[in-house]
Amino acid sequence: MSAYIALADGRVVEGRSRAPGTGRGELVFTTAYTGYEESLTDPSYAEQALTFSYPLIGNYGVREERFESDSVQPRVAVAHEFTEDVADWLEREGIPAIDAVDTRDLVTSIREQGAMRCGVAAGPDATPEQAKAQLEQCVEMSDHTDIGAQVSVDEPQVYEGSGLTVALLDCGAKKSIIDSLTARDAEVHVLPYDSTPEQVAAVEPDLVFVSNGPGDPANFEAAGEVVDAFAGELPIAGICLGQQVVARSLGGQTEKMEFGHRGLNQPVRDLDTDRVIMTTQNHGYSVADPGELAVTQVNVNDGTAEGLEGVGIDVITRQYHPEANPGPHDSLDFFDDVLEMAENHAPAMASD
């Protein structure tokens, strides 16, 4: 069965349909060579068409215990070759899947021209015109102004623990972030992305944590208002989009990257120790100006801010994914650091 990808640069790429349907999104790529289940269920890929640069996707099956959310998140999946397991899974999820594509050429186009809008049509009756019609309806990521509603919980959820209380603003949180906190005995209150400061205060948190998520951080104003309300009063942490939201709230600025960082092998240098770690990343925006925060870690490849910390206030954020899943575990101690920050802050709060 035929499939077509209509690109914003005017080209139409033909491939093979592995899961029928039409779709559209921002065409991006990941260099991850494992972890396709985690990538495909990562809420940060909402409203995107995910291309895998690794040629064979699905060579160790599909297991739900590795999922990072309850469903496949990208609007479209593209690879050089999908196995039957993955193709069947994507078809069950209603996600158009295309393979038999020269993904090297596609990735080169994204690297040279930047992430771009695309439209897709796949199946026995698919035509280039259908793909072009999808492209015409595709908008830029920044125009998805309420994308948080697609990926956040509707109601608060509580994960019991005997330790510190964490208010996690769910802007599209990966399951592994919650698991990393509960593994350290934290009680995690997962709150909707648009929670108010009053709703956050009601759980009496020891730590406010802004999660990862999709799209433009400028579209997560409510989370920024929570950060603004508690900065200096409670410890604050953030991962990926969370770093961007925290930075914007504390006087910083963010910008869209050409094609972003998506993969398992992004090198990050700690400016204090000069140590380099390998990290998992998935983001298309970065912090251009840290505002009131200090840059503590940078990307070795392009110098973008990978770690921020507060100056006189308790804030620690990371642009990469310390929880990995998939990827290296070089930075799992981030969760120990933020919980230690919260624990050390608690006596000071009690004495006020």
Kindly label every feature range from the protein language model:
Residues 1-165, 171-178, 182, 192, ...:
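RNA-binding accessory domains that recognize and position tRNA/RNA substrates
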Residues 202, 207, 211-278, 284, ...:
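Cysteine-nucleophile active-site neighborhood
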Residues 274-312, 352:
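Catalytic beta-strand/loop cores that center a nucleophilic Ser/Cys/Thr
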Residues 102, 240, 283, 321:
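Active-site glycine-centered loops adjacent to acidic/histidine catalytic or metal-binding residues
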Residues 27, 97, 188-190, 254, ...:
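Generic structural signal for residues in well-ordered beta-strands
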Residues 163-167, 187, 235, 278:
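Residues that mark the start of a beta-strand
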Residues 191-198, 216:
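Short acidic loop-to-helix transition motifs that present clustered carboxylates
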Residues 308-349:
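A glycine-centered loop/beta-turn motif at secondary-structure junctions
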